[in-house]
Amino acid sequence: MRKFIFVLLTLLLVSPFSFAMKGIIWQPQNRDSQVTDTQWQGLMSQLRLQGFDTLVLQWTRYGDAFTQPEQRTLLFKRAAAAQQAGLKLIVGLNADPEFFMHQKQSSAALESYLNRLLAADLQQARLWSAAPGITPDGWYISAEIDDLNWRSEAARQPLLTWLNNAQRLISDVSAKPVYISSFFAGNMSPDGYRQLLEHVKATGVNVWVQDGSGVVYELFVAGKGKTFTAKPKPDAEIASLLAKRSSCGKDTLYFSLRYLPVAHGILEY
């Protein structure tokens, strides 16, 4: 399964959660099915001992991955074990590997596509709201808002309509905070990007902005080449990152679980 990569170092939480979380992001992969229940439960307990309070599932469906009953059941068990260990749980919904490709469509085609995305997200939210032994503490829309395709107010109207509807309908399923992420790559002026974020925030969806301000720390070193490869940073460097605290009460998130020293020998990377 192709990686869905956070392309910048950190995320700034524009609209804060009800508490300043210290969270770890788990990007579920099919190969994680090899982890035993005992290994996973031990890993979740270790996260709590290290001071983490939140597990963020980046997605619960990725294209056709995690659509089979046995795959979903395993994700449910993993999430339930996290909450049993005392972690809060933010559930990522549907991730489309071709999300950015579809943004090049006409306005009408884009609106139709975003409606299909919303339907898929609602399906995941309903599924996870009804899952036994799980109470999601928040929802994550597994997509990224860039600063290229939504530069003009006219161009961003389909986006804002989608997010308005997503916040309202997902909250109808379970009244928990809804999140999405965004990144700045210099395609807009800083003031224009700020305005875009304000428009998104007005929909009621909380925005995690990848802006390099030290709220999410990458725990890996990416390899060179077109195909994504990565290995964990040295343990001492990771320990230094885990000791950091963000300013102004911002949430601190780390990407990702599989690169933590406590996950070595449990989750492949």
Residue ranges, per PLM feature:
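Glycan-processing catalytic domains of CAZymes
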Residues: 19-269
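Positively charged n-region of N-terminal signal peptides that target proteins for export
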Residues: 1-4
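Hydrophobic helical h-region of N-terminal Sec-dependent signal peptides
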Residues: 6-10
